[in-house]
Structure formats: C-alpha cells, structure tokens
C-alpha cells in the first residue's frame, strides 16, 4: 500500500523520513523485521536459561547494584522499574512532531533485531505512532553520550500503562487510551527496559529538525 511504510525493510534515509512525516504515512513492521526481532529474543531467552554467570542489567541490578542477582520472577519488574525510575525529564513539553519522530527512529532501530525486545513491544510503538498517541516528553534531562535515558523513559512509560499522553487533542491517562484501543500494557521482559532507554533518538530528532542545512 502506498500510504504505508514497512519499518525494517531497508535503510531509513532523510528522504524516507520526510516522506513518512509529510505524507502522514502509517507504519507496519516488515515480515523480515519480525523474524529478526523474534530470532534475537529467542537467543536472549536461551542465553539467560543456559548461562551460569550473571548478565549485567538482565539478571543483575544496575550500577552499584551490579553484584545483586535478580531472580527469574523479578526480571520483568526490574525492567519496568528502570523505565519508571528514569522518567524524570523536566522543562517544556516537546512538540508532537519530535515525539512522533522519536517513535519512528526507535521503531527502526529495534527492527534491526539486535536489541532482544519482543515483537509486541515494537508493534505497540508502531500503534502509538499510527494513532497519534503522543506521550509527554520534556526538553531537559538527557545524559548525552550515555543516551537519552530520561526522555526515552518518558516516551515509553505509557507503553506499560503509566503516565499521561495526548490523544485527540486532549491530555489523558495512558491507561485510558490503552483501554479505548483494547491494548494491554506491554509486559516488559528481560533487557527490554535497557533496549528502550538506551539510544539517541531524542538528540537525533533535535538535530533533524534544527534549522541548519543537512
């Protein structure tokens, strides 16, 4: 379909980004991208099951808690808490065009199949993009080289049913919008919080929309 762009079907160039935004194209996950994502997820699940050593940020805590082992029944909670604890950006609300671009760039990055996420996680990002469900992201809080942790945490908090979003011009609770669409909050699996928060999609979008010529 001409009004749909398949994420993960090839390189995401400036020209393609402009076409997606200017022509208001919808996104869908390319079949080959689904295969890559699932293959990587299967590998990670197998690695966790078979490994006899701790895996940082996956079966251990973060930072100074790196020596704390996380039990298998707490792996999901660890990732959800990571997103919640880092959703602390402040300042002015970012324009919706920036928020939507962040979704686009992250969906593309995850479609490459190197991050260990679930297919449903990427699909929900695409769902938010296609239906103009815009999380509230603020303009202060990025760590720069370490990644846009706080802005990305604010971006993805609504995927797990927490925080507020703009939908149909109104600010409302994310969980109410999920209910309206019949979407279950994404149950993050091991490593997914890390995959969502590590990235430079916020900075990249600011650069892309800057007045400087490309």
State the predicted function of each range:
Residues 208-214:
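Conserved small/polar residues in nucleotide/adenosyl-binding loops
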Residues 10-14, 30-37, 41, 71, ...:
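Generic structural signal for well-ordered, non-membrane alpha-helical segments
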Residues 119, 166-175:
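An acidic intrinsically disordered interaction segment
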Residues 22, 26, 42, 49, ...:
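Generic secondary-structure signature for well-ordered alpha-helical cores
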Residues 2-50:
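N- or domain-start disorder-to-order transition segments that initiate the globular core
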């Amino acid at each position: 379909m001409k009004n749909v762009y398949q994420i993960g079907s090839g390189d995401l160039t400036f020209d393609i980004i402009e076409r997606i935004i200017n022509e208001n194209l919808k996104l869908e996950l390319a079949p080959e991208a689904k295969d890559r994502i699932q293959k990587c997820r299967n590998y990670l699940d197998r690695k966790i099951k078979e490994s006899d050593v701790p895996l940082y940020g996956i079966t251990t805590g973060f930072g100074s808690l790196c020596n704390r082992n996380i039990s298998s029944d707490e792996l999901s909670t660890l990732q959800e808490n990571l997103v919640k604890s880092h959703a602390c950006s402040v300042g002015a609300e970012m324009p919706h065009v920036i928020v939507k671009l962040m979704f686009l760039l992250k969906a593309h990055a995850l479609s490459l199949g190197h991050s260990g996420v679930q297919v449903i996680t990427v699909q929900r990002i695409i769902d938010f993009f296609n239906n103009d469900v815009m999380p509230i992201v603020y303009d202060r809080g990025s760590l720069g080289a370490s990644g846009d942790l706080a802005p990305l945490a604010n971006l993805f908090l609504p995927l797990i049913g927490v925080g507020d979003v703009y939908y149909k011009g109104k600010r409302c609770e994310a969980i109410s919008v999920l209910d309206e669409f019949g979407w279950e909050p994404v149950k993050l699996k091991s490593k997914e919080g890390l995959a969502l928060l590590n990235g430079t999609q916020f900075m990249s979008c600011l650069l892309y929309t800057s007045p400087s010529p490309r």
